[in-house]
């Protein structure tokens, strides 16, 4: 019971931040269809679940990473618009927690870390609300930079191993700058 109390007393801002980030992205994803919205990942993920594969069975204009990730999420939660938006919302929430953790590791007070990470979550994925190649590639690159910074501070060998893997995933999200 004491450990649970310590967890919630120290991490309540992180929990609030995660749910806020997921909510704001989910809200903006449901406002309607806009020119920035892309349905290609929806269709490609559906085709992957049907047994087709990018470049082998059909042509894609972006990297296959988002399509395979989205097909995994469709497999778990079902194929519908809310699940499609959930993919972007979860990435927004996870990235906001990473930014929050980075600011805390730099010694910034947790309230300021929360504020800056919340501002980041408002600007990050809600601009499109749906999975988008530029966002995934940028966020995976930001995650790579954060792991690089943490690796320099903590000197953990497994973190150095994650850097090239995340860079490959970022490349497979969007190959062209």
Regions found by a protein language model. Name each.
Residues 105-107, 144-161, 170:
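Membrane-interface transmembrane helices that cradle and orient dolichyl/undecaprenyl
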Residues 121, 159-175:
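Membrane-interface alpha helices of multi-pass inner-membrane proteins
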Residues 1-25, 110, 158:
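Start-transfer (signal-anchor) and selected internal transmembrane alpha helices
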Residues 62, 66, 70-74, 78, ...:
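Transmembrane alpha-helices of multi-pass, membrane-embedded glycan-processing enzymes
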Residues 94, 99-122, 155-159:
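Transmembrane-helix signature of polytopic, membrane-embedded enzymes
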Residues 127-138:
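Short acidic/glycine- and proline-prone juxtamembrane loop motifs at membrane-interface regions
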Residues 29-44, 55-72, 79-82:
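Extracytoplasmic catalytic/substrate-binding loops of multi-pass membrane glycan-assembly enzymes
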Residues 15-16, 68, 86, 114-118, ...:
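Hydrophobic alpha-helical transmembrane segments
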